[in-house]
A protein has these predicted regions:
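Conserved beta-strand segments of alpha/beta enzyme cores
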Residues: 93, 140-142
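Phosphate-handling DNA/RNA-contact segment within nucleic-acid enzymes
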Residues: 2-115, 130-131
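Acidic beta-strand-to-loop metal/phosphate-binding motif
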Residues: 76, 114-126, 145
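A charged alpha-helical hairpin associated with nucleic-acid processing machineries
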Residues: 70, 144-147, 162-172
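Switch/connector loops and helix/strand junctions flanking conserved nucleotide-binding motifs
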Residues: 127-129, 154
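Short, surface-exposed amphipathic charged segments that create phosphate/polyanion-binding patches used
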Residues: 109-114, 153-165
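Short, acidic/turn-prone active-site loops that include or flank metal/cofactor-
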Residues: 97-103, 122-125, 146-149
Length: 172
């Protein structure tokens, strides 16, 4: 619950006019020091699409506050929920990409000065390809590929926070 509060997650129950499509979805705000710059909505059940954004909004890195908390390394996750798990639950600085197809070239400049950048890639073809692509852009990248069908969230539920800390320590 503390992680949800820190991430300022909410559920849309009484939407504003024109936002009825977000009812009963998890609201995930994109926060900066200036305030909310975007909100994405995730289905709580099996509704499709799983994720929805505000009409006309552009994509951003999620959890940019991690840049101010990180020291020599930072992690990248696929998606907001995995980022919340790694950063707010495991206390490992992480930013998130809202889907591997939403990576923007200028993000590499934000990550270039870290000694190490760890990509916790999902255990699917998209995660594998994302790791290969990002490795061409970031010389300081270390890809930690999840097993087939796994991601940060499922690995946390199975192995706990120490799993990620050990992966990072073993790669340094």
């Amino acid at each position: 619950m503390e992680a949800a509060e820190r991430a300022r997650l909410g559920v849309v129950l009484d939407p504003l006019t024109g936002h009825e499509q977000y009812v009963n979805r998890l609201a995930i705000p994109y926060l900066t020091k200036s305030g909310v710059v975007d909100i994405r909505f995730r289905s709580i059940g099996n509704e499709e699409p799983r994720y929805m954004g505000l009409t006309g909004a552009t994509t951003h890195l999620y959890n940019v506050g991690a840049f101010f908390r990180a020291s020599s390394y930072i992690c990248i996750c696929e998606g907001e929920i995995d980022t919340i798990t790694l950063d707010y639950v495991c206390n490992i600085p992480a930013v998130g990409v809202p889907g591997v197809n939403n990576w923007k070239k200028h993000y590499t400049r934000l990550l270039a000065d870290f000694d190490k950048v760890f990509l916790f890639a999902d255990g699917d073809n998209a995660g594998y390809e994302f790791g290969k692509s990002l490795a061409r852009e970031l010389s300081n990248l270390i890809v930690i590929q999840a097993p087939e069908g796994e991601d940060v969230n499922t690995l946390y539920r199975t192995h706990g926070a120490d799993f990620f800390k050990e992966k990072i320590a073993g790669a340094q």
